[in-house]
Amino acid sequence: IYPVPDHSEMLFSIQSDPEETGTSVGIYFMTDPMPMNTLADYRRKLIMRFQDVMFQQRLVELTKKEDSPVLFARPIEGHFVRSKDVHYVGAWVKEDQVEQGLEAVLTEIARIEQHGFSEGELARAKYQGKRFGEWWDQGDKTWSDYYVGQCQSNFLRGDPILNHEIERKLYEELVSTITLGEVNDVLGDWF
């Protein structure tokens, strides 16, 4: 495992690609890897999933504002390398409004840090999570890359491989126990 050193200062890079047709900005927040071995670890994963769903909805609302410099934005939580986990926020911005687009995304992150999410946002995220049930019901139609990702995580990180029935049971057992306070507390782990 090659370690990625921690740092207190912001690191940045400006890149261009003549073949790229759009302009984007990306922000990476790195942490030490979080284990996935216990029920508590899986519960934390659900909390983070809800946080991502709510953050995604905030970013969608940002793109709908009149004259928004952001065309599309998305948060992604995952593994960067084996020695670091990452929370990534990517935004596709108007060509001539890169700084304004980055500022808009950072402003939304600051707003979330300061005020957190609301009960209504969490209720909507939990409702959307129930739609996973439709996906779990179609396990025989799941793309193989889902299983490849599970095998990779198991081999590289020791994460368990969960089948659809187990994952559905865990979700249904845990979803009602997750509180807004817990979701808002996890923000401090990322931002």
Walk through the language-model features, giving the residues of each:
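Short, surface-exposed recognition loops and adjoining beta-strand edges that mediate ligand/DNA contacts
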Residues: 2-8
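Short, surface-exposed beta-strand/loop micro-motifs that present aromatic residues
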Residues: 9-17, 187
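M16 family metallopeptidases and their MPP-like homologs
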Residues: 16, 20-43, 59-175, 180
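Long, His/Glu/Asp-enriched segments that create or flank divalent metal/ion-associated functional microenvironments
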Residues: 44, 48-52
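Divalent metal-coordination and catalytic microenvironments
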Residues: 49, 105, 183
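Segments forming glycine/polar-rich beta-alpha architectures that bind adenosine-containing cofactors
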Residues: 178-182, 186-191
